[in-house]
């Protein structure tokens, strides 16, 4: 119809016109000003058109050229191609949409909707403009030129921004599926193509490729922006996009969104919020049984480590939740917060939590969305650096100063398939990579005490879940949208602000996850997180053939060393090696046990050496370790061999041979100050051993041994550290009292004390014997400094049967 115009015959049959305009059409005239010249006698619009501001019919490119002194460099390439051509032909074309509301056309109803929206937003300065699809240069583009708009006439900034917006047009054709092409379509184009609203508290947070008008927005000082798609009732065809631009930041979405939706409904139009499809109905509220424990877990994590916010996310389908970002295609992939299973530790971020509650995410978006696709923890050092398409709440995170975030997916054992994702935001001042690593290690202690009603998702479940999801979707006739993988994009980025990593959780139990999670994290030369085993995506991780072929004979070769060294030599991570050991019936890495025996032997040797007049050979401890790889793997056999060898060693250290009927290394034989071998009753011998040890320590110690009576101790508690010296004879009670006094802790019974052993593992101190073992282990360290760690006791954390939370 571009070359012909309709004859304006007053006698034309009205039924013919109704049929012609039923599906909508383009009209063209030589005088575009005639289009909007509604006559009070003929117009059926229930409003005064004089209250509207309309775009000028003449071409505005010349005025803009004069304004900037040159052609606007931000204009789209389609507009550049039309330079030199008479653009008035575009200004003379008008789209008449399908009629469906008491004889009003779609355009008339959109004009009415803009009027209503203007009334709702009259309290503050705002610009309301409509973007509609038009054909230009053989392509379909969105433009706001010659379209209805409204703004505060007293605000020149908005008037200027309106003139700038008229020179932009955005493609409505998605040529590629990558994220970069989606960014180039701009905010209106993304909303038109995605058919879901998009908003930001401040457009100045956009990158230039995401929002081409960002520089002009900064110059005009515009802030909050909301863009929503417009549909006919019962139709999935997007008619256009309404954009609301404000001069103030927009943190809360609900008031403005509800006003716009009501304005559209008043003229028989709608936005994207849809009822739950009947085939997908059926909420599963059984997950609520786990919420009290989750609440306590989040609260304790925030209070212990001063976290600003912790949230719980669940599928919208499980909650039967609706939202403005839902449509028929993405509903089964939409997740949202459980508002009564969140904890706000910092009141200044409460509005951010409310924004998270309003803004649902799709699986794959942000750290939370990625966690729903894996079975291991996901971490980002700075979520505020994500693009809006990768994490829709990135601008809100920037606004509230939130950066580091970690999320983990857990499954409720009572519900079977209901998954929770727990999201923890690190403190605002925790920006340094090393500080974030320490915080992750600290959080691992909390996660070690996760409620027993929750567990991690195994790799097998993850694979089966993917297959069943596809089958269910096909059966219900729902189209799967393309889910963005936000973390793979960051694997090639060297800047720490853009790191989005998936921790290798494997198929570990929750207890193991607590000890391994965050452990061994380091920062490489590119300032990105790494570890010896790497952070591979769990969804892509397969068990290697090498893991399946690691036999007991292979493990025996590494028994003399630490578990970490063995894992590195074999080529697996420590968690995997532990799992392999359990498959072979090895519940504890043997070198740990044998080293304990070795420390006891060394202790006996020191006692013997301190006794005057004692002659004899030293205990052959070196040969004891050398023979260890030949020990049997069976715990019973290992125990018998150790007892046999120890008995032989002790007998060899005395001049007169004697029987060795003892049952353990510490009680198998004894020595007195006269180096006599006692042959009396075993109970007397045990008593004599104890007395002999005390006598030799107090009376017969050499000067060097007396100097060693004091030990250097270094204690870490949260971010604080202290150093002091303690006597070798210190009991656990004395040690705790000394630490509590220095850290000003009133009730130290609520805390656990751990020491760092030779395997670089934290071992709990429960009694005086543990302290004695700790001293023996640490004597072999360079400098002989005992490193201790004070942490909140596990009894202070919520247990499965407790719903009252942390102790006061």
From Swiss-Prot:
InterPro entries (UniProt xref): NLP (IPR045012), NLP1-9_GAF (IPR055081), PB1-like (IPR053793), PB1_dom (IPR000270), PB1_NLP (IPR034891), RWP-RK_dom (IPR003035)
Keywords: DNA-binding, Nucleus, Transcription, Transcription regulation
Superkingdom in the source lineage: Eukaryota
GO CC term (a single one): nucleus
Domain PB1 residue range list: 710-793
Record field: compositional bias (Polar residues): 56-68
Compartment(s): Nucleus
UniProt biased composition (Low complexity): 663-673
Region (Disordered): 56-83, 660-680
GO terms of biological process kind: regulation of DNA-templated transcription; response to nitrate
One GO MF term: DNA-binding transcription factor activity
PROSITE patterns, A to Z: PB1, RWP_RK
Ranges of residues in domain RWP-RK: 536-617
Role: Probable transcription factor.
Listed name of the protein: Protein NLP5
Native species: Arabidopsis thaliana (Mouse-ear cress)
